[in-house]
Amino acid sequence: MKLIKIAAMMICALMLFSCAPASPGVDHDADENGKTTNQQEDNGKLINSTVKGEPSGWLDIKGEPLDNGEVSDEFTSATNAFALALLENLDDDWTGVYSPASLAMVLQLTMQGADEKARAAMAEALHIDMTNDDINVNNSRLLSALGSKGINMANAVMVSSEYALNGNFAAIAANFYRAETGTFDFTDGRSVVDSANKWVSDHTNGRIKQLFETLPKDTLMLLINALDLDLNWKTSFDAEKVYKDLDFHGTNGDQKVTLMAAKGEFLCAEIDGGKVILLPYENDECFMAVALPPEGVSPNAYLGKVMGRWNECKAREAELWLPKIELNSRLELLETLRAMGMGEALLGGSGNFPGLLDADEFIQIGDVIQAAHINVNENGTQAAAGSGVAMKRGISLEDKFVVRCDRPYAMVIVHTATNETLFVATVNNIE
């Protein structure tokens, strides 16, 4: 069998901004080097949190073992609903890729420092009606579930040495999110950018080397999430059946593409007039769902009907024709999230995030950006994405199942055991 690799990296970064350093708000002791640390007891284990002092780089902070229980259906249903809500706010002819799983995790980590108004707004936009404790436990379980061979998710927190990281937040980040934590000199923006980009590169096997170019003025904290996949197809595409210069009938007219063919037994179904086929990976822990809507229906609208209905697919002989494609996307999501109900947590709202830092500051989400890349070919798939959240001081043959994607279609990568939607891509045009 020819191995077809998928490599997908999702990086979410949270950037906090303020105009003035806060006075230290926690008790602390100087260590032998004159640096200060605070220790908070959480579940019987001491968790080091940062306080105002000299920058020390990455700290040796160890959290509790991840919870290996089952991720709840309520939790994954929320992520999948969030994925669809984002899609509904994109243009019907949008072509691109994004990762709801990684974006949801970094936003849910941010929620741990939110006040009541900000938290309620974020929960509405994230479609999640769970306590912080339940959210944290399920994220711990998701990290554990995604920790198998070929899949990895990681988090990091970078804090300005002029500010004190809230001890309770530090414990949550370490115990439930396995976040690597460090203190840095944010007055030296280039050094912080280099440290952040090195962390991203290290946690994506070098596939994303530069998430940040520069830091906006008054940045005081970064929260980063990385999701990395490197898996082989269980059934490979036929290398001898790669057809060049065929027409893809996009919404902007016909474009010449290369189509790859695969035959064999797949899980597939006709749902609401369209076709869905599932492509499993060798570890049986993830699959890609390819959704071909009925004529005249956009991939966005069709995903709204079929997302989460993968269990309707049944085994049968099938044939898939899938384009070789490379997509690059950039989404500025602040106004999208505002439209989804997150306004009170965003710049201009009345919500605050007092639980992130021991600082007397009024902090809000100032920007949310996601950039993503996916490359699908007969030899493999590489996918990469970066997301930033800036926190600022407030102010059809009957007897043969054929899926021929020579017109707009969609792709979804799903973690089988948890049903978590890892990546979503829609293709309306191919340039």
State the predicted function of each range.
Residues 223, 275-291, 398-431:
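Extended hydrophobic
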